[in-house]
């Protein structure tokens, strides 16, 4: 996938963060929808004794236990698909990181689930940023993330959740951000 869009002029650095509108979520949402509807129709065909599918005839299946199992899998697959498409439409986790020297603030913004916390926005003064920290763990569960390290020893993650970014991309983003803010880059 492409690197996140990073726009910069001399005083403002803004990085767009990709949320749930990723190709993998769209792919699995579609697969779960097709599979869930297929199993649901197969289970209903078994119960109603009427063929509701184009590709095969499941009306001859015994409803208990085969038909009810197909119905259960269909409901589960359809529910998973609805959840995935709900998060895709709302772009959960999407947002931006903005470092603004004009206002002297860093703003981390993300979209959340509906409710009082739909808009998640956190702002800190640029003066509170001590360093940019890169966290790299290789192995079975690879972890590559960038954090802002604040004076209160608090760390705010900057990278998106999901597929880890490449090591060179992490280094480039971290170096550009550290250079822009005039703080050290730690962890590399």
From Swiss-Prot:
The chain crosses the membrane at residues 26-46, 70-90. Its main location: membrane. Keywords: Membrane, Photosynthesis, Thylakoid, Transmembrane, Transmembrane helix. The keyword Ribonucleoprotein does not apply. It is a multi-pass membrane protein. GO terms for cellular component: photosystem I; plasma membrane-derived thylakoid membrane. Pfam families: Ycf4. It comes from the Bacteria. One of its GO terms (biological process) is photosynthesis. It is found in: Cellular thylakoid membrane. Signal peptide: none annotated. Belongs to the Ycf4 family. PANTHER family: PHOTOSYSTEM I ASSEMBLY PROTEIN YCF4, PTHR33288. Seems to be required for the assembly of the photosystem I complex. This is Photosystem I assembly protein Ycf4. It comes from Rippkaea orientalis (strain PCC 8801 / RF-1) (Cyanothece sp. (strain PCC 8801)). The lineage of its organism: Bacteria, Bacillati, Cyanobacteriota, Cyanophyceae, Oscillatoriophycideae.
